[in-house]
């Protein structure tokens, strides 16, 4: 049975301090990277306890790298294997798009890889197209067969690859593949996210030679083999950002422990425009929300622009800001589904293709809503904090993919929030 979250809002001013987990978007490719080691152990610390991490652990374990996860210590030990399997089967890959990043490591080590189509997306769709074209440029032959993508190359060769779009997944997959290739690979128009830097840091500790991560040109010199290493997962900037918005919306005063302001520049800049105060302290970043937020215009872009993963949460802040706000989503299609649910709480919004015009409304009323995706579920809970009366958020399986104990952290900051079994809901 699924759970639901019940928030009683309208009065809450969040106060206190909050600890942020390791980044989900970093740890999944780090787990894929463990497949590249043919000797030793890769030890990952600061690992977030999330359903996506369990799924990736199962996949990597199935492929031949033995995984043990000590949840109390937030530590994963990945024991390398002199041989790994070539096929990533449907039951592991279908549940999680990010699992496509095992293709690069398998191909690099085995000269061939068979990976089930992730979440049933067709090859022509943009996200995976870039990965495959990159593999082809490195000398692989790609075929599609019975729901599987197959790549074959006796030995991958270094190549000069230009990405049409700075896709995070493609950048990660191609870096992973290039680590063991013959010669040097140059990736141009590469994604620049902090999670890419984190991946390169681990790979270099494992014996790879990756330079330029965090810029749009990444150069990878292939090495003979890779080994174990120790690495602490970078902090989750999206979780940190979500708590920044929560403090901003509730006239709160919240210290985000060890926050890396550098990773959240665009968000901090936009929230500052809305009247939020940020104070850098020794132990983290203090976020102080104003009496009333001011409206603002936001456009999502690849890093270092405003992150699409903060778009839903930001629309929740815009919903209670004074005046008309604009949100333009340029990174993903179809990422406004949560706005229809927010309307039930009283959001006033006009949507034209990828642009939402939001009229701020300080008179929101709690309602029953269901989350449409991971970030939307957090955004609906944030809106519930400021809406008068009771908001019930269902379908929490989305939330658990990317937030650990989200309701408990909010409760510790003073929110009136509980999570209970959903007797009559659909999960």
From Swiss-Prot:
Catalytic reactions of this protein: phosphoenolpyruvate + UDP-N-acetyl-alpha-D-glucosamine = UDP-N-acetyl-3-O-(1-carboxyvinyl)-alpha-D-glucosamine + phosphate
Alphabetic keyword roster: Cell cycle, Cell division, Cell shape, Cell wall biogenesis/degradation, Cytoplasm, Peptidoglycan synthesis, Pyruvate, Transferase
MF (Gene Ontology): UDP-N-acetylglucosamine 1-carboxyvinyltransferase activity
CDD domains listed in its UniProt record: UdpNAET (cd01555)
Sequence positions that bind phosphoenolpyruvate: 24-25
Catalytic-site annotation from UniProt: 121
Source organism, top-level taxon: Bacteria
Function description: Cell wall formation. Adds enolpyruvyl to UDP-N-acetylglucosamine.
Protein family: Belongs to the EPSP synthase family. MurA subfamily.
The name this protein goes by in its record: UDP-N-acetylglucosamine 1-carboxyvinyltransferase 1
